[in-house]
């Protein structure tokens, strides 16, 4: 152990002149012209997920799957330990990239090809990197669209998550620019166009049958079913600390002075970070759908169609798009269930279904060509695929 003397220090402020010519105003994030196709950003900061953080996320966001709550249950199914929720892994990976990717963003346009490729356990440390796939510049006065691929690595530099998203960003147009973290040439970026899931040898313990509801096995799900989830979740100012807990640095989500300077539906007050809304919606579906999920096969075509604010109550509806018997492909009897999740705000899911019916399941961006109006109560839409245990 190194021992270094540390004497009390004297006050300096009262006798130190103020130097107005040495003022620093660090600016974070990138404008549209600061992105170049093919660049790779290594994002600052890493996050170690301890056991308490993992369980707190799962319970705060209402996930009922015992894999994220019980080490004994997870180990009995062949995993090394309790799993970190896939939504927590996704939120951390996205949030670590905000400073480089989207801190100047006007909006997140969509999530695509989200793939969870390896288990994440308590005490794992996650880092993230982003590759710029495409920059669509629509002119000086219009926001452009930046398409990115982000990967998330654990402390062994193993790929645990890969996903893509599109971000709407303005050009600087005279606004002061920052000095974003430089691009790393020849950065290690183990992306893959042919993702492979790496899981341990899974087991099917019978002693945990009572740990989950009997109506959430693969055999319970049929194409065409619609699950109207009966409980909502009122979002409070808790979203402020949770935004930073997962590493998101965009001031739109926690700075009232910043938000009050923005006009339009995204301005006036802090917007709840969309990844948290996504996690709450998935959590609300879990008792009906994913309680017996053994692995999250991913998400795609995810869109935040309206912002959420503190005080909003969010509700959810799930539609079963397809089911596929996977036999023993994963070592135990399972099946894949392809879902469409619809998020709503300030309306009960029952009332929304009665009021809007099949229009709920039509993409909001497709409404115009079908001669329909967008729904102000609808806040989110995404497709998800999950691997669910059979009854055994």
Regions flagged by a language model, labelled:
Residues 109-155, 300-348:
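Hydrophobic beta-sheet segments that form the core/acyl-binding groove
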Residues 138, 158, 171-173, 237, ...:
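Residue-level signal for secondary-structure boundary sites
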Residues 147-169, 335-383, 390:
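Short peripheral tails and domain-boundary helices/loops at the edges of structured domains
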Residues 2-109, 161, 171-299, 357-381:
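Hot-dog-fold acyl-thioester-processing enzymes
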Residues 1-4, 123-190:
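Extended, hydrophobic interaction surfaces within ordered domains
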């Amino acid at each position: 152990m190194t021992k270094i003397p540390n004497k009390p220090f004297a006050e300096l402020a009262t006798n130190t002149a103020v130097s107005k010519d040495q003022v620093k105003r660090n600016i974070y994030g990138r404008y549209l012209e600061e992105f170049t196709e093919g660049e790779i950003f290594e994002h600052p900061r890493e996050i170690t997920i301890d056991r308490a953080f993992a369980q707190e996320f799962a319970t705060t966001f209402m996930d009922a799957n015992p894999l994220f709550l019980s080490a004994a249950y997870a180990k009995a199914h062949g995993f090394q330990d309790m799993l970190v929720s896939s939504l927590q892994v996704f939120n951390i990976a996205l949030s670590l990239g905000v400073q480089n990717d989207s801190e100047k963003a006007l909006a997140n346009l969509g999530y695509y090809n989200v793939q969870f490729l390896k288990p994440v356990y308590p005490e794992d440390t996650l880092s993230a990197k982003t590759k710029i796939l495409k920059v669509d510049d629509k002119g000086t006065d219009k926001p452009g669209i930046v398409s990115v691929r982000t990967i998330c690595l654990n402390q062994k530099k193993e790929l645990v998550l890969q996903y893509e998203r599109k971000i709407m960003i303005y050009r600087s147009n005279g606004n002061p620019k920052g000095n974003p973290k430089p691009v790393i040439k020849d950065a290690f970026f183990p992306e893959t166009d042919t993702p492979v899931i790496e899981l341990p040898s899974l087991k099917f313990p019978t002693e945990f049958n009572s740990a989950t509801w009997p109506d959430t096995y693969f055999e319970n799900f049929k194409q065409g079913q619609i699950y109207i989830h009966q409980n909502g979740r009122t979002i409070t100012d808790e979203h402020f600390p949770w935004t930073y807990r997962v590493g998101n640095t965009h001031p739109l989500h926690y700075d009232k002075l910043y938000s009050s300077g923005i006009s339009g539906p995204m301005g006036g007050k802090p917007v709840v970070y969309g990844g948290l809304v996504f996690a709450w919606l998935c959590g609300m579906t879990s008792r009906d759908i994913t309680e017996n999920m053994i692995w999250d096969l991913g998400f795609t075509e995810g869109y935040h169609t309206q912002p959420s604010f503190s005080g909003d109550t969010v509700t959810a509806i799930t539609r079963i798009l397809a089911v596929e018997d996977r036999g023993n492909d994963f070592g135990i009897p399972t099946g894949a269930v392809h879902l469409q999740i619809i998020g709503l705000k300030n309306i009960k899911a029952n009332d929304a279904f009665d009021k809007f019916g099949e229009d709920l399941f039509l993409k909001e961006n497709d409404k115009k060509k079908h001669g329909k109006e967008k729904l102000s109560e609808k806040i989110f839409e995404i497709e998800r695929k999950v691997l669910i245990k059979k009854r055994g």
